[in-house]
Amino acid sequence: RDQPRSRGLGDVYKRQMVQSVAAVPCGVTDYRQNLFKQTPYDAETSAAVIDIMEEFGDECKRRHGKRIIYPSDEWYLKAGRPIPEPEFYEDYDQLENGVGMMSLFREEFLAELEKPHRIYGTKKMDVVTGTMAAPLITEMMDELRRQYPMIEVKVHPIKNNFFGGNVGVAGLVTATDIIAQCEGRLSSGTLGVPAVMLREEKDTFLDDMTVSYTHLRAH
């Protein structure tokens, strides 16, 4: 544990004024010409980061009653490890940085399914998401279909060719990739898009196409 990053985390839990710290893997795109070399994290190195973060988080919990240090969801997905339960994230202080987002989504989605809903007729819908979140979204849609057989949801994992590299988060998926990969494959008249794919308070993707235009082009 003599690496600088480990020593840095050790300094964090000695300072009680720090509310929370998140670790997020660097997204390596195809647009890194003339920049320093950045090797993407793989399953093994991601697991090592999780072990370090959880160890220091446990120590913070013992010292201060709060974990303070959190790995983002991406580390668990890259390492092939289960996303922690909601209790792990406490107050979700780092939710905007992708820490606990998947755990919270799963918890809220399943809680909503427990409520009674009246649904008439068959409902069809297409949903797009990033490659990282696709397994969880598919799992939740399967659970939805199990409880409500009249609802059909087709999940489309979108590979990020726009930015390339190892980018797999839903928030960086563009309309360009959605159109290219979904054209002729949509099975309904409704397209579900995660809010994180859109510009803040706007109905446009990062490449400035609107949701309605994207749906029209992809259908």
Question: What is the role of each PLM region?
Answer:
Residues 17-22, 27-217:
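Auxiliary Fe-S-binding modules of radical SAM enzymes
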